[in-house]
């Protein structure tokens, strides 16, 4: 019983943060700077997707720079595969 209550509260908290970030994203930039608290502005960054110009796992490539981080272009069939690294 206690576990289900804690899980429910955690899910509600995540939904609140997600909804707040989505609302913040929809509002104009003028309103975003003046009305919202600083912690909400920082939470917005979590829900924004990164737009990268790279190929993901098993994507076609011609050189290593075409692939995303921790991926390398395999010469055999020209696809991006894990390069074996773990660091940032």
UniProtKB/Swiss-Prot annotation:
Principal subcellular localisation of the protein: secreted
Subcellular location(s) of the protein: Secreted
Superkingdom to which the source organism belongs: Eukaryota
GO molecular function, one term: ion channel inhibitor activity
Cellular component, GO annotation: extracellular region
Disulfide bonds: 54-68, 61-73, 67-80
Record's signal peptide: 1-21
Annotated propeptide span(s): 22-52
Alphabetically ordered keywords of this record: Disulfide bond, Ion channel impairing toxin, Knottin, Secreted, Signal, Toxin
Tissue: Expressed by the venom gland.
Function: Probable ion channel inhibitor.
Family: Belongs to the neurotoxin 10 (Hwtx-1) family. 41 (Jztx-36) subfamily.
Comment text on domains: The presence of a 'disulfide through disulfide knot' structurally defines this protein as a knottin.
This protein's name: U13-theraphotoxin-Cg1a
């Amino acid at each position: 019983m206690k576990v289900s209550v804690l899980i429910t509260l955690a899910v509600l908290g995540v939904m609140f943060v997600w909804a707040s970030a989505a609302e913040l994203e929809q509002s104009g930039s003028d309103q975003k700077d003046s009305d919202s608290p600083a912690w909400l502005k920082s939470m917005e960054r979590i829900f924004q997707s990164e737009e990268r110009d790279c190929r993901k796992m098993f994507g076609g490539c011609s050189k290593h720079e075409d692939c995303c981080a921790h991926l390398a272009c395999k010469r055999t069939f020209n696809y991006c595969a894990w390069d074996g690294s773990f660091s940032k």
